[in-house]
């Protein structure tokens, strides 16, 4: 579900967020329109809007953990977790976490990847929110859901700042809700 479908249509914070995200054509390869959140992070007002919208949504959902996907989920996850009184759990690329981990491989558009999580990070029946900067195919979010559920957590929702408009990966999310603030085609519409 996009934020504009959830009562935020016309909210000036969405325009500020959209305006703060730079689109870089043909990066990292031809045909890709890279959604660069670096410029969003340089705008403290827009960055705060992102955190505030997510906090408003999740503060009464009894979320006990926020799982952030490496690397940009690490940017948004901790301030949201602190604001709603939850712990933050990093989901990392292989070999980055000390101690015992569980792993989940997943398909990318052109290949495979893997996420890992500390086995001590999650307790059975905790309520989890997964946060990342962008959803394209749903592969990374799906792997994140699998990791958390294998550890006994209940995934309440997945949340991303940007959702690609042709996203078909919701079917990969095992029926879990997806909440997205903006989509790339909104950038042009909102700046008219």
UniProtKB/Swiss-Prot annotation:
Pathway entry: Purine metabolism; AMP biosynthesis via salvage pathway; AMP from adenine: step 1/1
Source taxon at top rank: Eukaryota
EC number of the protein: 2.4.2.7
Location(s), subcellular: Cytoplasm
Catalytic activity: AMP + diphosphate = 5-phospho-alpha-D-ribose 1-diphosphate + adenine
Primary site of residence: cytoplasm
InterPro entries noted in UniProt: Ade_phspho_trans, Adenine_PRTase, PRibTrfase_dom, PRTase-like
An annotated GO BP: adenine salvage
Xref: Gene3D superfamilies: 3.40.50.2020
UniProt-listed Pfam families: Pribosyltran (PF00156)
Activity dependence on pH, as recorded: Optimum pH is 7.4-7.5.
Gene Ontology terms for molecular function: adenine phosphoribosyltransferase activity
Assigned keywords, A-Z: Cytoplasm, Glycosyltransferase, Purine salvage, Transferase
Any GO CC annotation of this UniProt entry: cytosol
Role of this protein: Catalyzes a salvage reaction resulting in the formation of AMP, that is energically less costly than de novo synthesis. May contribute to the recycling of adenine into adenylate nucleotides and the inactivation of cytokinins by phosphoribosylation. Possesses low activity toward adenine and cytokinins.
Subunit structure of this chain's protein: Homodimer.
Similarity remark: Belongs to the purine/pyrimidine phosphoribosyltransferase family.
Name used for this protein in its record: Adenine phosphoribosyltransferase 2
UniProt source species: Arabidopsis thaliana
């Amino acid at each position: 579900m996009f934020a504009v479908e959830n009562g935020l249509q016309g909210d000036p914070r969405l325009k500020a967020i959209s305006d703060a995200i730079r689109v870089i054509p043909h990066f990292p390869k031809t045909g890709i329109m890279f959604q660069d959140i670096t410029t969003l992070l340089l705008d403290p007002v827009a960055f705060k809007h992102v955190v505030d919208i997510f906090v408003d949504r999740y503060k009464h959902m009894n979320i006990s953990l926020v799982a952030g996907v490496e690397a940009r989920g690490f940017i948004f996850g901790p301030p949201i977790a602190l604001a709603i009184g939850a712990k933050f759990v990093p989901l990392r690329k292989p070999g980055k976490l000390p101690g015992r981990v569980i792993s989940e491989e997943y398909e990318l558009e052109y290949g495979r990847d893997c996420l890992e999580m500390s086995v001590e990070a999650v307790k059975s029946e905790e309520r989890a929110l997964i946060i990342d900067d962008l959803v394209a195919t749903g592969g990374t979010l799906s792997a994140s859901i699998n990791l958390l559920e294998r550890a006994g957590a209940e995934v309440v929702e997945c949340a991303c700042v940007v959702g690609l408009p042709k996203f078909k990966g919701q079917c990969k999310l095992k029926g879990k809700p997806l909440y997205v603030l903006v989509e790339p085609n909104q950038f042009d519409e909102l700046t008219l």
